A protein has these predicted regions:
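Mixed-charge (Asp/Glu-Lys/Arg
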Residues: 1-28, 34-144
Length: 144
């Protein structure tokens, strides 16, 4: 619950920071709606957040059923997207991409997954269809 709420809030913040109008809708299949003010882009976003314990950072993320996001997006005239937020210990990664494209690159057969190998992540960083950002812990702190 905490990880999911954090992931949704982080995606909302980042989209808003970059000029999108956003709303948390918590509708079956989608969590967020975001659109450009000029109306040129309207997204229904299913957010998937995962936290990782030390040593488990490379474990793939199991993905939601894609069809659940398509139904409300069709009803509301939105393009279905997925946001995948993963806490990898010293870095939090967020990826945002169209669901149609995610289906072509997601691994797995029965259960679809987002691999967390460095090779896969580097390919996504260089992929023009994937928007992404990383928050890294570089500064010193006194936080436990």
């Amino acid at each position: 619950m905490i990880t999911g709420d954090f992931a949704e809030a982080l995606v909302l913040y980042w989209l808003s920071k970059h000029g999108y109008e956003c709303a948390c809708v918590d509708h079956t299949g989608i969590d967020l709606i975001a659109f450009k003010k000029d109306g040129s882009e309207r997204m229904g976003i299913s957010v998937q957040g995962r936290s990782r314990y030390p040593g488990t950072e490379k474990i793939a993320v199991n993905l939601h059923q894609f069809q659940e996001a398509r139904v409300p997006c069709e009803l509301f005239g939105l393009i279905p997207h997925a946001a995948i937020v993963v806490d990898g210990g010293k870095v939090i990664r967020c990826f945002l991409l169209p669901l149609d494209y995610l289906e072509t690159i997601a691994g797995g057969k029965k259960v679809r997954v987002w691999p967390m190998t460095e090779r896969f992540l580097e390919a996504r960083r260089n992929d023009q269809k994937v928007r992404w950002f990383e928050l890294a812990e570089h500064a010193q702190s006194r936080w436990w």
